[in-house]
Design a protein with these regions (language model features):
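Oxidoreductase and adenylate-handling cofactor-binding alpha/beta cores
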Residues: 26-27, 73
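Short beta-strand and adjoining strand-loop segment in the mid-core
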Residues: 3-13, 18, 22, 45-62
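Rossmann-like dinucleotide/flavin-binding elements
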Residues: 25, 39-42
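Short, well-ordered secondary-structure micro-motifs
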Residues: 43-45, 92
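Short, catalytically relevant binding-site loops at active-site mouths
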Residues: 1-2, 38-40
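Conserved beta-loop-beta element that borders a ligand/cofactor-binding pocket
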Residues: 28-37
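Active-site-lining helix/loop region of Rossmann-like oxidoreductase modules
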Residues: 52-120
Length: 120
């Protein structure tokens, strides 16, 4: 495909997560978009704490609950449900921004934390 890794590659229509859900629609599989904005360097160093938020979305409440439980077993990581799977394109679009920031600031561990909102 080419181009800088910090550019967004739009998948029409929707997102990679929606495309996966469409491919799997005849199987008894529930798709949850997660971990898009968590550095692979962080994930490779579990159980070290990851001081980031993990945005998730999906169409099945139970599947999102399972994903959230897995995410929150990782020290420091917090799952934030942003809604249905049609929001996955938003999460996927953040990833190149985060990669670009990590490149610019010579880091492998940059991430996002949502502040100012009471999620309880």
């Amino acid at each position: 495909i080419g181009g800088p890794v910090s550019n967004v590659l739009h998948i029409n229509p929707g997102s990679a997560a929606e495309r996966a859900a469409n491919i799997l629609k005849d199987a008894d599989v529930k798709v949850v978009a997660a971990f898009n904005n968590i550095s692979n360097s962080h994930l490779a160093n579990i159980p070290n704490p990851i001081e980031c938020d993990c945005l998730i979305c999906g169409d099945d409440g139970k599947a999102k609950e399972i994903a959230s439980d897995i995410i929150e077993k990782i020290p420091g990581l917090k799952a934030i449900d942003i809604g249905p799977l049609n929001k996955a394109h938003l999460i996927e679009s953040i990833t190149p921004l985060l990669i670009g920031m990590n490149i610019k600031f010579k880091s492998h561990y940059g991430g996002f934390r949502i502040t100012g909102i009471d999620f309880e």
